[in-house]
Amino acid sequence: MLKNSGSKHSNSKESHSNSSSGIFQNLKRLANSNATNSNTGSPTYASQQQHSPVGNEVSTSPASSSSFRKLNAPSRSTSTEARPLNKKSTLNTQNLSQYMNGKLSGDVPVSSQHARSHSMQSKYSYSKRNSSQASNKLTRQHTGQSHSASSLLSQGSLTNLSKFTTPDGKIYLEMPSDPYEVEVLFEDIMYKRNIFQSLSEDKQEALMGYSIEKKWLIVKQDLQNELKKMRANTTSSSTASRTSMASDHHPILTANSSLSSPKSVLMTSASSPTSTVYSNSLNHSTTLSSVGTSTSKGKKLVSGSLKKQPSLNNIYRGGAENNTSASTLPGDRTNRPPIHYVQRILADKLTSDEMKDLWVTLRTEQLDWVDAFIDHQGHIAMANVLMNSIYKTAPRENLTKELLEKENSFFKCFRVLSMLSQGLYEFSTHRLMTDTVAEGLFSTKLATRKMATEIFVCMLEKKNKSRFEAVLTSLDKKFRIGQNLHMIQNFKKMPQYFSHLTLESHLKIIQAWLFAVEQTLDGRGKMGSLVGASDEFKNGGGENAILEYCQWTMVFINHLCSCSDNINQRMLLRTKLENCGILRIMNKIKLLDYDKVIDQIELYDNNKLDDFNVKLEANNKAFNVDLHDPLSLLKNLWDICKGTENEKLLVSLVQHLFLSSSKLIEENQNSSKLTKQLKLMDSLVTNVSVASTSDEETNMNMAIQRLYDAMQTDEVARRAILESRALTKKLEEIQAERDSLSEKLSKAEHGLVGQLEDELHERDRILAKNQRVMQQLEAELEELKKKHLLEKHQQEVELRKMLTILNSRPEESFNKNEGTRGMNSSLNSSEKANIQKVLQDGLSRAKKDYKDDSKKFGMTLQPNKRLKMLRMQMENIENEARQLEMTNFAEFEKDRLEPPIHIKKPKVKKMKNKDRKPLVKPQEADVNKLNDLRRALAEIQMESNDISKFNVEERVNELFNEKKSLALKRLKELETKYKGFGIDFNVDEIMDSPKKNTGDVETEEDANYASLDPKTYQKKLDEINRITDQLLDIQTQTEHEIQVEEDGESDLSSSSSDDESEEIYQDASPTQELRSEHSELSSGSGPGSFLDALSQKYGTGQNVTASAAFGENNNGSGIGPLHSKVEKTFMNRLRKSTVSSAPYLEELTQKVNKVEPYEQNEDEGLDKKSLPENSTASAASAFDKAEKDMRQHVENGKQGRVVNHEEDKTADFSAVSKLNNTDGAEDLSTQSSVLSSQPPPPPPPPPPVPAKLFGESLEKEKKSEDDTVKQETTGDSPAPPPPPPPPPPPPMALFGKPKGETPPPPPLPSVLSSSTDGVIPPAPPMMPASQIKSAVTSPLLPQSPSLFEKYPRPHKKLKQLHWEKLDCTDNSIWGTGKAEKFADDLYEKGVLADLEKAFAAREIKSLASKRKEDLQKITFLSRDISQQFGINLHMYSSLSVADLVKKILNCDRDFLQTPSVVEFLSKSEIIEVSVNLARNYAPYSTDWEGVRNLEDAKPPEKDPNDLQRADQIYLQLMVNLESYWGSRMRALTVVTSYEREYNELLAKLRKVDKAVSALQESDNLRNVFNVILAVGNFMNDTSKQAQGFKLSTLQRLTFIKDTTNSMTFLNYVEKIVRLNYPSFNDFLSELEPVLDVVKVSIEQLVNDCKDFSQSIVNVERSVEIGNLSDSSKFHPLDKVLIKTLPVLPEARKKGDLLEDEVKLTIMEFESLMHTYGEDSGDKFAKISFFKKFADFINEYKKAQAQNLAAEEEERLYIKHKKIVEEQQKRAQEKEKQKENSNSPSSEGNEEDEAEDRRAVMDKLLEQLKNAGPAKSDPSSARKRALVRKKYLSEKDNAPQLLNDLDTEEGSILYSPEAMDPTADTVIHAESPTPLATRGVMNTSEDLPSPSKTSALEDQEEISDRARMLLKELRGSDTPVKQNSILDEHLEKLRARKERSIGEASTGNRLSFK
């Protein structure tokens, strides 16, 4: 309600009592009428109640005029019906008295001033009151409510529920079968929920685009919610109705209250302590209820009656017809109606929970609920409560916590309402609301003050005069301090602020507000903490709450001071605020150091200065002074100062200014100095005049200091310039971004989504490709990991092998006492221990590394077979060693012997060769005994070797080596002692005896082998010692000689031992040959070498090639037989032993061939040459000899296995063992074949053809062509020279152009004109131009002075008529020459004049004149460049230079869309300005650097218009903008072409990807290749067989042909695949993408992609740090950055995408190349990769087509052959039958006749099928076409031609060569079917006679049938004539009857013999 609404329209002057009594009477009547008419309503309402799904629980009413658009408004009620109260009237005394006294007449509606504006849209529209009742009783009627209101139980929901209600009252929510019903229900919900009203059209379309199922789900959920709420409210309906009836009859006012004046109605009087409030619900049907409140003085407060809206309340009450009290409310708080809260507020009984519920309800409920709350004036009720309880009360009352909470809760509701337009309207309409909010500005609670400030900010958000006035009035209102509880509390707590005031003093709201703000800031603690802070600060939320409050306060101040349009009002407000201390408050706010608040303070200052400036300008305008006119300014100043003391000062000031300026002007100094001086003076005057202080001297000093600070250094100026440039660039970027966004916005509905989807698809494709590449790389990484682990396995194998080799070698030692040393082949104990330790450490380290790598890689590999065997073998050896440790060697260890020495067999050998002394007989037994002992020692050594083979532990080696060395030492001593006695120590004798008794020896060895007790060996050693003592005496005589020989041998042994040590350290795995050599050279003993060989063969798994072959120092006496015997014995022992043999031994014995030993003579030869004086030299020579022998054996094919040093390190033993003689040879041949099978390098290009070969002819041809050109060009010349006598007319082809088409050419060079010799003969003299023209010009133009001179001529050139000219007109229709007469006649009639206008050619005179004027201008460009400008810019020829330059600089759309122009202006030869051109154009050029406007540019020294057009364009663009023109055009080129180039490159990449994917996924292609490989390996020899082939092999498949040269190898492959594996042929369709990518060069594609990305990067760098970064150098009109910057991010994005994609593509491509065995590093291989596949596919298809054609021909041939053979067979059978039949009957003849007819029919059909004309070549087809044409043209002469032909024997074949005697052979040669007979060509005379026709009736029937069948078989195009066919058939039948029955027919027939 508006303020003072009751006073201005009150016409009654009744007393207060009368008014009061009248109100009560009306209220009683209204209550009675409500009680009686509560259930009455319109018929529509009643009917709707009947159809309600729940009876009468929910009442609905028809929609009003503003209701939902889909519902029809009910008809207006008649005058006799009861009308509701007007919504816009207030329930005051005047309105009630009008109802009582019947002052409302007829249909005149009642309105009040305080009604809402009609412009405000409300959810509820009510009909105006129009009552014509005779009585004064008030009736109530339900009015139509808005169906668009989003109430919880609206009419729409109830109507929708009724659709799903069954007759029995149950509700079944099932989806309707009609989708339209679901659409309607969904749309109703959207409107009911107010969703469509708050969404844009596109979002509405998106909602309506939901599927039917989704829409029904939403509808069903809404209906279920409505049903749930309806059922919850049904239970309280009866109680609600009863309590409603009770409340209607309850007396509203129980105490008398007087109304002093109508001002008390619905408003609060500011002067009286008693407040009377009336709350009007503004609804149709009203019910009054009031709550009286008494003040502290005992006065009763009259509360206005409150109207009631039954329909709305009933909706929210679940169907109750009347309102209920709080006690009868249901428990569900969400369904409380607005009237409930209003009643509770009026009764001041609203609890804190209900306040919170009200606040939540206002925020969360639909708008109709809030509208209903506002319509019930709940906000006014809350304002009244606050006014009565806090803001206008007695001083003795205290401000309790409940009151503060109530105030805070009410202000929360106020803030929610202020967010709505209805709430803002109510706040601005009722002064009570603004007063209440203003009172809350200085509340003691910070949150309340903040909310009050926010409410005022919402009111002043938009410039609204009424709201501004309402706020301003409330702020300017005065109040008494003692009436406001907040001020009373502040007065008591902070008396220092109120020292000059009392409780009776009055303050303005604005003062109290600013006081509250300041004391809030003063309550802030130290350094923003709670130390020293006030209670309000501590309880108000801390620092953040203070900051937000200050921010809202400053926002409110700025809104308040800038809301008014009146500058005086704004300045007055600021002045008042500053007087109240706002500046002091701002200073305190600045201490908070909050940016947002400081910004608001700066905004306040800026607005203040702006208003001040406007005010000054307005004051100056009052003096009629033009501030922009200096004369007016000086005149006014002079008028003011004239006649005063200021006159001299003003004159002095002007004089000084003039003198200082004129001095600089006279000195002709630079204008910049004058600018600086004027700037200095202006700055000084500005700072002095604007300063606000009163001290003039201070102002001057400050002004000067400020000026100096601003201009103190050049650095500041430069920085300012740079900042300006940066800001300018940023502005351009922002503008460009704005344009780009606007363009995107314009495209939002036209493809932007599609573009984004395409980009998303591109990224998805790149991601998929990246995933594929990652998978490939992961697979490669897994393979590398496996290889690494396998290498670890191999390393372990090598270490174990070396450790086994080292452990298996016997230990050698020295005998220092006797001074002899054995030849040492192995290391001493310490070195061996060190090596073993190193190997064991390496083995453990390898195991650890393998475990670590396996753990790191997350994968484990099973060891290979060899490693498993080695591990198992070493474990077995360790187990054997443990068993040996348990053996008792105590007796043997007590006699510790010296380290053993090797037996020197070479000495024995030498002794054998010398002359030996005969042995003494008694000594023979000793010798035999010694031999037996040696055999026993050999067995002992064998057993010891067997043990050492499996000995790994060092301790076990030492035990057995000591025993073995002791025996060997004793044996060596014996040999040494008896060496001089001539004893024969030949090993042959020793080895023969074991051969004889092999079985016995083996038995003994088996017995000895079973025992390892050292006592047995000790007994044998004792016997040896005894024999040795006997033989020592005999040895003395040869001791000296033996000593000398021992010294030589020891030297050799030591040297070889040293060499052996070095070799072992250098190479841990020597070759097998070197091992055997080491054993033979170092040990020198048979058993020792055998131990080494045995250890190497069975201990390490290797085969010894020649264990005893290299006997450099001996011939292996006793070793050969002993070797085989011991090996056999050892193998027997090994089989019987518990230690299982290695599984690979059998494999080795199967794969490794046995090595034949060297022959005896070779060994003897070696022995004879052994042991020279120099032992080292002899050893070296022995090695050389061994190597030579090995090579010789390999060459002779005797050596089975040769392994070099490198192969032993790397090759696998099984693989090496396969190399025999044949394999070696095949391997060599394979290698050579592989080398030869590689594709040869491409042949070099053929040399260029020598120029001398064709030089003269080419030169002559060129000269002749030039001559022709000269003739053509000279033919166009307008003024030829007078001609000589004319030669014969030249060919017409030499002269082509008419006169005037081209400008006159330059004269032809003499060289060309004189070159007439050569290919063409000398030409005649040149023809006159007139005759040359006559070849092509119109006959209207004269060809010679004598011809066509009488024809009329046109005044201007016309379009030419091109015709074929007839030169010779004699004896033709043109000879009369009548055309000239017709021309004269037409000319006289004006027809030719009209023709001249109609066919006028385009005028070129203007262009010629322009060109002539242009030629007069200056040009510096070359002719070529000028012509290029004219050609490339021809589309802009109509534009002037300035317009063209402007178009180019502005980057117009048509310019950017012309790629040719952009490309031309980007050419390097165009944009590069040479030094000479720059110097020439310097006077015409303009410097645009730093120029922002065209007017500011310095004009050039010379006028550029003096230059030609091309020069002007070149000057304006390339010269003036040379500093950045190149970069500019590059940027524009990228911007205009990047999308096209990106799409082209992307398309090529897509093709490559498809091809790569096809090749990767095509298993059929791989299968075809495997078929080719299989067939090729079958055809090739073993040396040329391969595991795969390169792609270049595919090209050679067509080179190989079969024996008949009819089919290639590829044809056979295709046939094999098609017949046996037909599915493999699918690779032809799978590899279709490969054919599309053949023409794409991979290298070029990669380079193009790199160039594309690099060009974009270059442009970005140019914009960032390059030539385009400084926009001050640009032309003022240049908009290159605006066009470039928006596009660069998108271009860079595409460049990055393309770069990533090409990288992935190339990775996949190179991986594919590796897959097919190609080298990715070979450029030629990359280029030809896809081409090889494409060629193969094409050749394969061609081969397939050839095969199919050949098979089809073969099939047809076989078919025809079968048919003919069957016919021949039947004919032969018939002949036999006829021959057998002697007397055929007539019936039989008839049957034979029928059979003959059928046979003739069959043969005839066969002949007709095969007798077709053969296909001829196209040349014969052309000949036939020509002949056919000639034949048609001369059809009349055809019969004569046919009659003239001379035919032979009635031939039925028509041929032009019929008269040729050789034609018969030609015909027979060319015809596929031999001719049977030759008859005469049929004519009309040759037809059979009628008598013959009757006789041959059957034959004619057969021929007709044959002819019809022939047409069906061959179609209508078969060139067969009916007569010839008929004659042929008749002749055959005649011949058949004449011949005998048994003869065969002579028709056309194929025969196969």
Curated annotation (Swiss-Prot):
Comp. bias (Pro residues): 1238-1250, 1278-1292
Residue ranges crossing the lipid bilayer per the database entry: none
Disulphide connectivity of cysteines: none
Biased composition regions of type Basic residues, renumbered to the chain: 1821-1830
Compositional bias annotation for Polar residues: 41-100, 110-143, 263-278, 1217-1237, 1880-1896
Cytoplasm in keyword set: yes
Location of the FH2 domain: 1348-1766
GO CC, one annotated term: plasma membrane
Listed SMART domains: Drf_FH3, Drf_GBD, FH2
Compartments in which it is found: Cell membrane; Cell projection, Ruffle membrane; Cytoplasm, Cytoskeleton
Gene3D superfamilies xref list: 6.10.30.50, Formin, FH2 domain, Formin, FH3 diaphanous domain, Leucine-rich Repeat Variant
Complexes and interactors: Homodimer, and possibly also homotetramer. Interacts with PFY1 via the FH1 domain and with actin via the FH2 domain.
Domain comment in the entry: The DAD domain regulates activation via by an autoinhibitory interaction with the GBD/FH3 domain. This autoinhibition is released upon competitive binding of an activated GTPase. The release of DAD allows the FH2 domain to then nucleate and elongate nonbranched actin filaments.
Family statement drawn from the similarity comment of this UniProt entry: Belongs to the formin homology family. BNI1 subfamily.
This protein's name: Protein BNI1
Organism whose genome encodes this protein: Saccharomyces cerevisiae (strain ATCC 204508 / S288c)
